[in-house]
Amino acid sequence: VDGARDAAARATAALIREEQRRLETFLARRVVPFPPATRVLMVAPHPDDNLFGPGGTALKYVAAGIPVHGCCVTDGRACVAARSERARMAGRRAAEERAVARFLGVGEPELYAIPEDELARPARQDEAVARLETSLARARPDALFVPYFLDLHPLHRLVCHLVARALERSRAELRVCSWALGAFPPPTFVVDVTAELPRKRDAARLYSSQQELRDYVADVEFAAAFHARAYGPPEASACEIFFAQPRAEFVADVLSRGLDSPEALAAGAQPVLPEEPAR
């Protein structure tokens, strides 16, 4: 009994220390024009993620003359239920991603086009890591943007694991800036994108495949407004937020969590879309 109580006390003390660290990070958060960088690489699990997360910040980098490169790991085909339609959806989403990159003024995106429903396979993961290593070597970023590794979407978490594998062998000194749709620690950087929101909204409309599934533009607006209300300065009506870590800390943190395990991929997973019945 005493041993169990001691273990529980240690676990509670560790939890309190972690919450204290989070509070200190929150109090130290900085409202910045954009996270410091001279070269930027943004990694998207799906086409549209680089707009939804850091799209307004990308616009600010472009306006400042800072090169922004983007890559997308999967083809996003699994947003439709019918397998017979998935190849067509993949092509459509690739065209949308290129159109949005042109609209934002960022570089031509690198589309790995790995079938979304195959990324859980080890061979596909190895392929993604190799492609990520090439993208990192080509872009030579000092700021790397990815989804938060405990994001509620399992594929976002898996892509973070693959990014960490690619970074593990890199000696590059860079800062990893994570964004999230759901779970998130207190942000390191808050970026006021009030002025950029209209253009981000217009870019979101170019993802017509997503707008047909849900009110995608409203989702973009809501996330920006929520972040402004929760973390932004009083004058901001739209913000993007980022949790920043040095490369080595990010790699150690992510690779310690087994995010590529079947259990992790199943945790919080969205229901798998059923095959539409034959007619």
Walk through the language-model features, giving the residues of each:
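A conserved mid-domain beta-alpha-beta active-site/ligand-binding segment of alpha/beta enzyme cores
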Residues: P186-G232
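Glycine-rich phosphate/pyrophosphate-binding loop and the adjoining helix
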Residues: F226-D253
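Active-site beta-strand->loop->alpha-helix modules in alpha/beta enzyme cores, enriched
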Residues: V1-L174, S178-W179, P198, R205, ...
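A short acidic, often aromatic-flanked loop/helix-cap motif at beta-alpha or helix-coil junctions
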Residues: E116-A120, F184-P185, V251
